[in-house]
Amino acid sequence: MKPTILLYDSGMGGLTVYDEIRKKLPNAHYLYYFDNACFPYSEKPTEVLVERATKMVQKMAKNYPLDLVVVACNTASTVVLPTLRKIFPFPIVGTVPAIKPAAALSQTKTIGLLATKGTITRPYVLSLIEQYAPNCQIEKIGSTALVELVEQKLQTGVIDLTRLTPIIADWQNHPTLDTVILGCTHFPMAKTELQQLLPNVKYFLDSGNAIANRVTHLIMHSPHNQQLEKQRENLAFCTQQNNQFKQQAKIMQRWGFPQLNTLMI
C-alpha cells in the first residue's frame, strides 16, 4: 500500500514542500488542497485559519484514507497545529521558519526573516527566535504582496522586479545581513530573484528539506492505512472555481497532479 499524504495551503506555495517530500517518497499518494477562496492567509484572523483548516482536513479524511497531513503554510502552522492534532488520529506536520539552522549558519548573527505579516507577529515565531536565536539580530519583513507575486510567477514564469524591489529595499544595503529565512512556503519560488537583488546575502534558507525528513521518518515508522482505494493518482483540490481555474489546473498538471477538483468548505 502506498501511504496517502495530504498537503494544504492557501495557494500553491505548498508545492515547494511537496517537491521536497516527493524526492524522498516518490511512490506516495499525494493530495494537494489549496484554499483559494481564502487566499492569502497572511493577515487572516486566527479563528478563521483554525476553522478552515479543520473543515478542509475533515473533508479530505472523509473521502480518503489519510496517513499524514502537512500544513504546508507557515502562517497557518503558527496557529492550527494544536487543534488539528487534538481532532485527528494521524500525524500532523507543520511548517515553521528555519530559525534554528539560520542561527547556526549565520556568521554575522544578523538574519533576515522574510515571511507574511501574520507569521512575523505570531507569538509562536517570537518564541522560536527567543529559544534558538537569542544572540542574533533578527530583521523582519512581512509581505502579503510577495505571496501574490509568486502566485503570478506560477502563471507567467516571471516576477516583476520593480514590484519585488520595494519589498526588500531595507535589506539591499544592509552592512551585516548574511542570512535570509524564507519564512513562507511561497518564497522559495522567488529565491532566484531575491539572490539577484540581495547579492551580499550568503544563505537563503527554507524549511522544505527539514519537513521532508520529518514526514519520511513518520511514514517509515507508522502503519499505513489499509483501506483500499480505486483512485491512486495524485489529486489536487481547491475551495473555489474562479477565472484562474483553467490556468491553475495546468500548473497542477506540471507538478504531477493530473486533475484539479473543486471542493468547497
UniProtKB/Swiss-Prot annotation:
Q: Which transformation does this protein catalyse, written as a reaction?
A: L-glutamate = D-glutamate
Name a biological process GO annotation. Answer: cell wall organization
Q: Which residues bind substrate?
A: D9, S10, Y41, S42, N74, T75, T185, H186
Q: Which Gene3D superfamilies match?
A: 3.40.50.1860
Spell out the Pfam families in the cross-references: Asp_Glu_race
Q: Give any GO molecular function from the UniProt entry.
A: glutamate racemase activity
Enzyme Commission no: 5.1.1.3
Active site, UniProt feature: C73, C184
Named in its record, the pathway it takes part in is:
Cell wall biogenesis; peptidoglycan biosynthesis
Entry-linked HAMAP family = Glu_racemase
NCBIfam families attached here?
glut_race
Role this protein plays: Provides the (R)-glutamate required for cell wall biosynthesis.
Give the family, as the similarity comment puts it.
Belongs to the aspartate/glutamate racemases family.
- Recorded protein name is Glutamate racemase
Q: Which organism is it from?
A: Haemophilus ducreyi (strain 35000HP / ATCC 700724)
**Name of the gene:** murI
